[in-house]
Amino acid sequence: MKYIQVEGVGQVSRIGLGTWQFGSREWGYGDTYASGGARDIVQRARALGVTLFDTAEVYGLGKSERILGEALGDERAEVAVASKIFPVAPFPAVIKQRERASARRLQLDRIPLYQIHQPNPVVPDTVIMPGMRDLLDEGKIGAAGVSNYSLARWQQADAALGRPVISNQVHFSLAHPRALDHMVPFAERENRIVIAYSPLAQGLLGGKYGVDNRPGGVRAVNPLFGTENLRRIEPLLQTLRDVAAEVGAKPAQVALAWLISLPGVVAIPGASSVEQLEFNVAAAEVELPTESRDALTEAARAFKPVSAGRFLTNLVREKLPF
């Protein structure tokens, strides 16, 4: 495993574990997964050197935090647990109250990384961040982070906090490389981290899906899996397959290895089984030659998906009986 030392948080593994599916039903894992599989995954993750575990108060309406806290057991205070507050009425007193509720569910006295889940379109960070600053001053959290913030808003949050907002968790993968342009350079320059969620684009970068093998379930409504986008992304998937063959890994592992080869970037894929977790963690050992990494970056930049509106139009046309 590879690590980044993050001020206030500690040693952060470059491959972490996203736990949005803990306690949720939309991915079809169910109660057995929550009570047994999730615990086994977390414990195996620790054995493999994973230290970053990401959750949020809204995941399973608090169930994810409870399951994670119980699964970590006595090690819960020794790892980089990251949770998030959804910014409804994000005033200082409310933020402090809800952080304490998350800490109780996680069975922690101190949450290493506490993040604003998304920008509030009405309430500015000058109102939100004083509550985060109080939590820092009181030692209730180790560091403040944000999620789904633009670079400009991240910088505004910095100014409002009066100290570094250490992380920004964003949608980032070879299929969604927007963070490459400005966010990654900023993180490198300012000694911050970018936390990549959906790093495998819901499995698209594993190479399993294509025009002739469309997914069902929640993936079916993801524009990336539309027919036109599956055609457009094929050159990127072929580059992934070529690099994977070159380095002796699987395409999904190469996709993760590309992310964590970038300065200040860590990835938090989910896992539905211990085997999938082990597969993801193995990506930390994949070394990409410079030429291969550059080829992947070029292919990612070249992929231009159709808009969500066009995806919906195409989807309706495909479903019509003529």
Predicted regions located by residue number:
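N-terminal binding-site loop/beta-alpha segment at the start of enzyme catalytic domains
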Residues: M1-V79
